[in-house]
């Protein structure tokens, strides 16, 4: 009887330790890159070019022939692949894509405002602060998930953010957050920029500034972030592109499509680098999303968003990485909110995001 009890005791210890080891073995993601493209509609993400907008002389910039030649196909799966080839090949085959409302797969802003600062705050803080109600809002008083991650010993000083729009200095609370935030026309590279960063800074200074000093062209944000990724090896990186929103506000549908297509190409660029580098290969997750939607019921409102635009709360996201089952386009009926992204991002790194404010639960099914 004594031998049996001893054997049971050691068996329980063995099972306990094995379970711990198994749980650690299951966590493969060591790095994450969060990527956003401002105000890019789910309608184009899942349906490709919208012919009703492309045919409208008010929006097609007098070049509907080029738009059709480059982005049109009668079949929707082919059409969306023309616009976003990386999303609909690599991400669709190895990751998950959410937000196609044709299948009642709904992803929405939880905040009631449906524009940028509140949307990004919801993404990173994991809850809705209704006081955050302006793009000119002060430094965000709410702790964001990047800030939380940066305080964890394993990730300390391994977090960085790059954004085309200067408001990210306030959205992420640059004075407080403790990690580099490089936006708009802020020089990259800190006190010791590399030769490539010095060149980027010089080109940025002399560049065309269609959005004044508030926002740079996406090409600069991309190459700043890529140089940081390659030379400083962060474990957590956020990159925010802005031209999809800017060209939409201008009513330039061709430029909007071109910006989205280029965004897709840059995501591919990021992924190919990740898969070629030993630190990142098979150990990195990507989380791709937007801050808000745009109008669609009234096609003239595709340029706009905000609480007075019926469809502007409708968003989408995609995720891929070693811990995410390859489910492709999600066609099951469900409701997801933007405030769930923060905890989902933390969970992919094996963390639970806690803060002085509420944090919504993560999204089930994203992680093995």
What are these regions (language model features)?
Residues 1-28:
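Bacterial Sec-dependent N-terminal signal peptides
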Residues 26-96:
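Active-site-proximal N-terminal segment of extracellular/periplasmic enzymes that hydrolyze or transfer
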Residues 33-34, 42, 264-303, 345:
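Metal-dependent active-site segment of extracytoplasmic phospho-/sulfohydrolases and closely related
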Residues 71-170:
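Long, well-ordered early-domain segments
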Residues 120-126, 304-349:
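Substrate-binding rim/cap in mid-to-C-terminal beta-strand-loop elements of soluble/periplasmic
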Residues 125-138, 178-213:
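Acidic, His- and aromatic-enriched active-site or binding-groove loops in soluble protein domains
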Residues 175, 223-269:
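Active-site His/acidic residue clusters
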């Amino acid at each position: 009887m004594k031998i049996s009890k001893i054997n049971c005791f050691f068996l329980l210890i063995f099972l306990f330790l094995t379970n711990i080891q198994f749980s650690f073995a299951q966590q493969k993601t060591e790095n994450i890159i969060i990527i956003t493209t401002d105000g890019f509609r789910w309608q184009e993400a899942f349906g490709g070019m919208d012919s009703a907008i492309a045919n409208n002389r008010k929006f097609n910039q007098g070049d509907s022939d080029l738009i059709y030649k480059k982005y049109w196909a009668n079949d929707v799966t082919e059409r969306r692949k023309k616009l976003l080839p990386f999303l609909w090949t690599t991400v669709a085959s190895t990751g998950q894509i959410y937000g196609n409302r044709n299948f009642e797969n709904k992803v929405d802003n939880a905040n009631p405002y449906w524009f940028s600062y509140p949307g990004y705050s919801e993404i990173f803080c994991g809850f809705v602060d209704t006081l955050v109600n302006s793009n000119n809002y002060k430094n965000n008083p709410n702790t964001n998930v990047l800030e939380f991650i940066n305080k964890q010993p394993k990730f300390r000083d391994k977090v960085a953010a790059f954004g085309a729009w200067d408001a990210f200095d306030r959205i992420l609370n640059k004075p407080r957050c403790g990690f580099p935030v490089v936006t708009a026309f802020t020089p990259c590279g800190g006190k010791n920029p590399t030769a490539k960063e010095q060149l980027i800074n010089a080109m940025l200074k002399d560049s065309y500034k269609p959005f004044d000093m508030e926002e740079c062209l996406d090409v600069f944000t991309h190459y700043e972030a890529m140089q940081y990724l390659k030379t400083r090896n962060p474990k957590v990186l956020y990159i925010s592109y802005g031209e999809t929103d800017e060209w939409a506000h201008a009513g330039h549908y061709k430029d909007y499509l071109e910006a989205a297509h280029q965004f897709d190409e840059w995501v591919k660029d990021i992924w190919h680098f990740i898969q070629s580098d030993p630190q990142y290969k098979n150990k990195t997750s990507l989380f791709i999303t937007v801050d808000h939607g745009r109008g669609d019921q009234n096609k003239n409102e595709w340029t706009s968003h905000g609480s007075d635009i019926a469809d502007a709360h409708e968003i989408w996201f995609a995720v891929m990485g070693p811990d995410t089952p390859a489910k492709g386009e999600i066609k099951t009926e469900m409701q997801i909110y933007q405030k769930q992204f923060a905890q989902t991002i933390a969970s992919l790194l094996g963390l639970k995001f806690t803060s002085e404010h509420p944090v919504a639960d993560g999204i089930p099914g994203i992680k093995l």
